[in-house]
Amino acid sequence: MRESTVSVVVPTLNRPAMLLRALDSIASQTCPPYEVIVVVDGPGDETFRAVRQAHPSVRLLQLKTRSGSAVARNHGVQNARGSWIAFLDDDDEWLPRKLELQLSAALRSSFRYPIVFSRLIVKTPRGEFLMPRRGPGRQESVDEYLYCRKSLRPGEVFFYTSNLLVPRELFNTVEFRPGQKKWNDVDWLLRAGQVPGTGLEFLPQTLSVWNTEDFNRPTITGDYDWQYLFQWATSNRQLFSPRAYSGVLLVSIMHEAVKQRDRRATHVLLHEALHRGEPDTIQAVLFIVGILALFGAPRGAYQWLKLRLRTHLPADT
């Protein structure tokens, strides 16, 4: 019989007000965790004072120097005493039944190492959205779930660290990778998915809130660009099926290149996808949409193409 103790790990960086909001959401859980561990990434006297006053039962750990989210999470896990690990970033929140429902699903799972996640609310300056639109199929691998789209609609798949419940034992094999500038959660998930007995368990309930209103605040992760992500993908090609590999190149990394307005990405990504991947129709279409955005297609033509493509390609399943 599986144990049911949960350790919550919260990495933080110089934003005590947001951290207290996150800790309040943990304190409101219908299934209280065994312990809450806050890992302060570098100097943080103000954070220590705020947490000790508002949540005195929280375990406070501190890294001597700023080391990034991967090191902070790993340090928290290494000091955890629970049999399950849940992560919460300091600027995010949980809804009250998050731990209750995810732990119940984990204990029922047939996988040796179930990775449990659910829908979440994404709060942006443009409004609120629910993601992901679909969970993984029972036999769908991690890489193909993330990068082999079944529709053109945004938000079809989504994975986020604050929305996870993971067996503590799995971290004995796969930790977060220090030095990973971005996609640290996805990098971990892809590597964890290679461990025999690992599987994704998806809950359709909405259980977490990802707050993205303030893009100028300091973050633990740091900056990045599409070239960094391209190097990451090519260095870790063994983690992808050929179709998933073309998906990460033509859709996900191309999306970052569009945000940077860097046209050089077009040839680089297409060449790699054609030579080492297996692009499907939806990936090709989304890549073309990215090209139109990069090279300045008239907005009317751009929107017309997106509408026509949505009409003639599969909807969500």
What kind of region is each of these model predictions?
Residues 85:
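Short aromatic/hydrophobic "clamp" motif used to bind/position activated sugar donors
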Residues 139-225:
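Conserved nucleotide-sugar donor-binding catalytic segment
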Residues 63-80:
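Glycine-rich, basic loop-to-helix element that forms the pyrophosphate-binding segment
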Residues 1-27:
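N-proximal low-complexity "stem/linker" segments adjacent to membrane-targeting elements
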Residues 28, 44, 258-317:
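Membrane-interface aromatic/basic loop that binds lipid-linked glycans or pyrophosphate carriers
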Residues 205-214, 218-249, 263-276:
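Catalytic core of nucleotide-sugar-dependent glycosyltransferases
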Residues 25, 32, 40-49, 65, ...:
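A conserved acidic beta->alpha catalytic loop
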Residues 71, 99-170:
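Flexible acidic/His/Gly-enriched loops in nucleotide-sugar-dependent glycosyltransferase catalytic domains
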